[in-house]
């Protein structure tokens, strides 16, 4: 492409108070494009700064939706690309009784709301919703309640160490009662990725369902090239994931748009980005929707195995249009935003 980027890397270390400080630092040095943020709280912290400086935040993470900014390019999955496909799969293959467990945080609140409305619209039920403080690692009472209720599945929106510990405790509690947890009370998530499987540990790593647009197990030349390059760049890990792929896609889309525009001016870049930039990404073809500035992505369902990888269970036949506000679905969540997935295993 003839484009050479000089990255300016600042690490807030997960400290929310540092995001606005570091973002201001970059923006006042005339940095016009930032690929970054993971949590919704960090994204919301810095968006006003990008709007003030008329710069672009390239946000490379799946998220809960119901947001739009002319200064953000969303390369991760919107809710119709991860929550609704998971609901479709769970209701079709596991049952209609859900139990929600999440962190007391916007990611869990919104995803549980979407799942609740979608499940109840299809004559299902949500038996309970339990929320825990970020970082909580004691789930004994909640797990006892889940086992007593015997839901068709658990929808897990805990994040970080809380999620890892829940998987371990839940598997152990089920095993002690002779319950085959992965088959009888499967746990489903929209944020479980390969590096997190390694963090869970081998005793509880297998049999969990994840809804994502990318898994390392995708068989394609583009993904093989990505994984080879990733391993060369990060030989010590962590393993590639949906967030790594979304970041990779963001940089390539940015580079192509800058090359086409002949400038890094954010407005010119956005014009070229939506005009012609289709990327042969590791997950398949990716491009940006000109109305929402979210990405067309390919939803998939994976089931974790003992090798801390995912076996593909189903996938959409083609990239799905992003619908961050779910405006294209009917009141019963039965229309275009719940893409039909084909079984692959």
Ranges and model annotations:
Residues 1-13, 69-71, 119-136:
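Short beta-strand elements in bilobed, periplasmic/extracellular small-molecule ligand-binding domains
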Residues 3, 239, 259-271:
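Short, charged, surface-exposed loops that flank catalytic or proteolytic processing sites
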Residues 75-131:
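An alpha-beta-alpha
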Residues 115-116, 120-211:
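Extracellular/periplasmic bilobed ligand-binding domains
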Residues 2-65:
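Beta-alpha junction/loop-to-helix N-cap segments that form part of ligand/metal-binding clefts
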Residues 170-246, 328-329, 339-340:
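Extracellular/periplasmic periplasmic-binding protein-like sensory domains
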Residues 26-38, 58-60, 99-101, 150-166, ...:
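Periplasmic-binding protein-like
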Residues 281-345:
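Solvent-exposed, acidic/polar segments of extracytosolic/periplasmic ligand-binding ectodomains
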């Amino acid at each position: 492409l003839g484009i050479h980027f000089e990255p300016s890397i600042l690490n807030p270390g997960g400290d929310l108070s540092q995001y606005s400080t570091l973002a201001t630092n970059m923006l006042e040095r005339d940095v016009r494009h930032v690929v970054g943020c993971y949590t919704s709280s960090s994204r919301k912290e810095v968006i006003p700064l990008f709007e003030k400086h008329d710069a672009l935040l390239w946000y490379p993470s799946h998220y809960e939706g119901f947001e739009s900014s002319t200064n953000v390019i969303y390369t991760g999955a919107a809710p119709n690309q991860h929550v609704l496909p998971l609901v479709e799969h769970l209701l079709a293959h596991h049952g209609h009784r859900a139990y929600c467990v999440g962190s007391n945080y916007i990611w869990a609140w919104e995803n549980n709301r979407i799942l609740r409305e979608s499940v109840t619209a299809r004559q299902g039920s949500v038996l309970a919703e339990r929320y825990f403080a970020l970082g909580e690692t004691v789930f004994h009472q909640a797990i006892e309640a889940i086992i007593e209720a015997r839901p068709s599945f658990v929808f897990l929106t805990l994040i970080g160490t809380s999620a890892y510990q829940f998987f371990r405790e839940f598997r152990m509690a089920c095993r002690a009662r002779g319950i085959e947890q992965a088959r009888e009370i499967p746990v489903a998530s929209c944020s479980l990725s390969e590096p997190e499987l390694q963090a869970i540990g081998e005793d509880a790593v297998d049999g969990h369902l994840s809804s994502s647009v990318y898994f390392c197990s995708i068989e394609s030349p583009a993904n093989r090239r990505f994984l080879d390059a990733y391993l060369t760049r990060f030989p010590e890990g962590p393993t590639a994931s949906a967030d790594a792929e979304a970041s990779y896609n963001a940089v390539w889309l940015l580079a192509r748009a800058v090359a086409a525009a002949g400038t890094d001016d954010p407005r010119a870049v956005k014009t070229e980005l939506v005009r012609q930039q289709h990327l042969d990404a590791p997950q398949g073809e990716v491009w940006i929707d000109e109305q929402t500035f979210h990405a067309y992505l390919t939803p998939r369902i994976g089931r974790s195995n003992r090798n801390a990888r995912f076996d593909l269970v189903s996938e959409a036949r083609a990239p799905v249009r992003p619908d961050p506000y779910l405006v294209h679905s009917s009141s019963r969540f039965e229309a275009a935003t719940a893409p039909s997935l084909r079984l692959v295993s």
